[in-house]
C-alpha cells in the first residue's frame, strides 16, 4: 500500500473513532436529579387530593404531565441523612452504615458520582448535602449540615481543606441561593463537550418552615382543608405500640400538631421559634384544645406550602433556562423528596413513621426522547433503585455492590418486568428520638402493609411496647384500621410474616449490626399471649418514665 493511501486510511479510521465517540456522547442524556427536603407527595398537585385546589406546584405538575409519575416510591428509612446515603450508594442503610443522622459516606464509597465521572459525565452537587464527608463531585457547593433558611452559607472547593472553604450570601433565602448557584454553574462551569450529571438539592421545605417574605401573602386568606384524622382516629387504628395499653401512651408517642403531646408539639413550638409572629401562649386556658390545634395546623400548612411554592417558582427559573439553551429535552429530569412528611394526618408532624404519609416519596421522571407523557405507575420503587436508574441512562454497568435495580424499562414502557420487586422494606432505627417515634420495621406490598414496632434503641433499651399492625391498603389506604388480629386476615398476616423475614435476609438486615436490639426483635416476633402481656407491662413502665421526665422538666 502506498504511503498516501495509508495516511488517508488512518485519517478515515481516526475520524470514524472520533465520530463514534461523539455519537455515543450525544446519545447519552444529561441527568438532572432534583431533590427537595421533606417535600411530600400530598403537597404536589400531581399527587394531592386534599390540597389539590391550592395548586402549590404548577411547575412540578407540568413536569409530571410530561413524563411518568410513580405512586409507590418509598424510602427505606424516613430521615434525611439515611435517605441520601441510600441514593448515593444504592445500598440499604444497614449495608452502607448510615443508620441515622450521625452517619457519613466516605468519598471512596460515594458510588453514584464516582461512576458518573468514570462514564464521562461532568458532575456537580449543589444545595443540601448532609453526609458530613467532602462530596466526591467535580464541583460542589453545599450547605453545612442542615443549613439555614436565611443568610445562606455554602461549603465550596478551595485552597483550604474541607470544610473550611466557605462562601456566604447575607440576606439570601436558601431556595433562591441554591438555584442561583445552580444557574451560575450552568452558565460558568458547564463543559458543553460533556454530558452533565447535576444534583440540585433544596433545603426547603424542611422544618422549621421559613419562606421568603415575598410569599407572606400566599394563602394568607385561605382556610387550608383539614384531614379528618387530624381530629379523630377510629378505635381500630394503631396498637399498643402507638396508643399504649388502654390508650395511656397517646400523649407520648409521636409529636403532635395540637396539644396532645406535652413534650413536643407544633403548637408549643410556634411562639418559641417565631415569637414575633405568634405572640399567643398556647398554654392559655382560655384557648381550647380545638382552637389551639386549628391555629397550629393552619400555621403549619401555610408555612410549609409557602416553602413549597418557593421551590416550585425556582424550578421554573431552572427549566426556563434549560429550554433557552436547548437542554431541556435532552436531559433526564428526576424530581423527588428525600422522604414523605406528615401534613397533620393522625395529628402527627415530621416524618419517620412507616406509614405511607412519611415513607412515600414523590417521584417524577421526564425524558421525552424515550418516556411518553402522562404515564402513571404503581410499581414499587425504593430509593436504593434511584442510582441504578441514573447509571442506566448514562450507559454504565450497575456494580454488584449496589442493591438497587434500574427501573428504566418501567419509565419507558409503564410496564413492570415479570421479575420486578413486589415489596418494599423499611426500617427506622432512631427509637424515640426528636419526634417520639418507636423503633420499627415494615414490609409493604401493593395491597398490604405489615409493621413491626419492636420498640427499643440500638442497645435494646428504653423500650416502648412492641406490637404488630397490618393494614389492607386496598380497603384502607389511609391506614386507619389495624386488622392484625382479625381472623379473616390471619392467612395474609402469616404469609406476610414469612415474606417479611425472608426480605430482611434478602436486603442484608440480619441483625448483626446491633445484637442487643436484634434480641428484642426476635423476642417479640411471634407475639403470642405472653408477649402481649409483657407489652402491656412495658407500656405502663414507659408511661411512668415519661411522666416523671415531664415532671422534672417542669
Q: What positions do the PLM features span?
A:
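Residues forming the ATP-binding cleft of Hanks-type serine/threonine protein kinase domains
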Residues: 474
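A contiguous, mid-protein "functional segment" used to position or interact
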Residues: 487-522
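Short hydrophobic beta-strand that contains or immediately precedes a catalytic carboxylate
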Residues: 470-471
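Bacterial N-terminal signal peptides that target proteins for export
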Residues: 1-12
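Formylglycine-dependent sulfatase
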Residues: 8, 15-467, 477-498, 525-554
Amino acid at each position: 500500500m502506498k504511503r498516501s493511501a495509508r495516511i488517508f486510511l488512518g485519517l478515515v479510521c481516526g475520524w470514524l473513532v472520533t465520530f463514534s465517540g461523539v455519537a455515543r456522547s450525544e446519545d447519552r442524556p444529561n441527568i438532572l436529579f432534583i431533590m427537595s427536603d421533606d417535600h411530600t407527595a400530598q403537597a404536589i398537585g400531581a399527587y394531592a387530593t386534599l390540597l389539590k385546589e391550592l395548586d402549590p406546584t404548577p411547575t412540578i405538575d407540568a413536569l409530571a404531565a410530561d413524563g411518568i409519575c410513580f405512586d409507590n416510591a418509598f424510602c427505606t428509612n424516613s430521615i434525611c441523612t439515611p435517605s441520601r446515603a441510600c441514593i448515593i450508594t444504592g445500598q440499604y442503610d444497614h449495608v452502607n452504615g448510615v443508620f441515622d443522622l450521625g452517619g457519613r459516606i466516605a468519598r471512596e464509597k460515594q458510588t453514584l458520582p464516582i461512576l458518573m465521572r468514570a462514564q464521562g459525565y461532568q458532575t456537580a452537587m449543589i444545595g443540601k448535602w448532609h453526609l458530613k464527608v467532602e462530596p466526591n463531585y467535580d464541583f460542589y457547593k453545599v450547605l453545612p449540615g442542615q443549613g439555614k433558611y436565611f443568610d445562606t452559607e455554602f461549603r465550596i472547593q478551595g485552597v483550604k481543606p474541607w470544610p473550611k472553604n466557605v462562601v456566604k450570601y447575607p440576606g439570601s433565602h436558601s431556595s433562591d441561593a441554591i438555584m442561583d448557584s445552580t444557574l451560575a454553574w450552568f452558565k460558568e462551569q458547564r463543559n458543553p463537550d460533556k454530558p452533565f450529571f447535576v444534583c440540585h438539592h433544596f433545603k426547603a421545605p424542611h422544618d422549621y418552615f421559613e419562606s421568603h417574605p415575598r410569599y407572606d401573602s400566599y394563602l394568607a386568606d385561605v382556610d387550608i382543608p383539614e384531614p379528618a384524622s387530624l381530629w379523630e382516629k377510629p378505635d381500630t387504628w394503631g396498637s399498643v405500640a402507638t396508643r399504649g395499653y388502654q390508650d395511656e401512651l397517646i400523649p407520648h408517642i409521636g409529636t403532635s400538631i395540637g396539644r396532645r403531646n406535652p413534650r413536643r408539639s407544633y403548637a408549643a413550638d410556634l411562639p418559641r421559634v417565631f415569637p414575633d409572629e405568634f405572640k399567643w401562649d398556647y398554654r392559655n386556658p382560655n384557648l381550647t384544645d380545638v382552637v389551639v390545634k386549628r391555629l397550629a395546623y393552619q400555621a403549619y400548612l401555610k408555612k410549609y406550602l409557602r416553602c413549597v411554592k418557593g421551590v416550585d417558582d425556582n424550578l421554573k427559573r431552572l427549566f426556563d433556562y434549560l429550554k433557552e439553551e436547548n437542554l431541556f429535552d435532552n436531559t433526564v429530569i428526576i424530581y423527588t423528596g428525600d422522604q414523605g412528611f406528615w401534613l397533620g394526618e393522625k395529628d402527627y408532624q415530621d416524618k419517620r413513621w412507616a406509614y405511607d404519609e412519611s415513607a412515600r416519596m414523590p417521584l417524577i421522571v421526564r425524558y421525552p426522547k424515550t418516556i411518553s407523557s402522562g404515564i402513571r405507575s404503581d410499581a414499587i420503587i425504593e430509593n436504593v433503585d434511584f442510582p441504578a436508574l441514573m447509571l442506566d441512562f448514562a450507559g454504565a454497568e450497575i456494580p454488584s455492590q449496589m442493591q438497587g435495580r434500574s427501573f428504566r424499562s418501567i419509565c419507558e414502557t409503564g410496564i413492570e418486568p415479570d421479575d420486578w420487586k413486589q415489596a418494599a422494606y423499611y426500617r427506622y432505627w432512631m427509637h424515640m428520638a426528636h419526634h417520639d417515634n418507636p423503633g420499627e420495621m415494615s414490609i409493604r406490598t401493593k395491597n398490604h402493609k405489615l409493621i413491626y414496632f419492636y420498640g427499643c434503641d440500638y442497645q435494646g433499651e428504653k423500650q416502648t411496647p412492641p406490637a404488630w399492625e397490618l393494614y389492607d391498603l386496598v380497603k384502607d389506604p389511609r391506614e386507619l384500621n389495624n386488622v392484625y388480629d382479625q381472623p379473616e386476615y390471619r392467612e395474609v398476616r402469616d404469609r406476610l410474616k414469612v415474606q417479611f423475614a425472608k426480605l430482611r435476609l434478602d436486603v442484608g438486615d440480619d441483625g448483626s449490626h446491633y445484637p442487643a436490639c436484634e434480641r428484642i426483635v426476635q423476642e417479640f416476633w411471634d407475639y403470642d399471649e405472653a408477649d402481649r402481656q409483657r407489652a402491656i407491662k412495658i407500656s405502663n413502665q414507659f408511661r411512668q418514665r415519661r411522666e416523671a421526665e415531664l415532671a422534672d422538666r417542669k
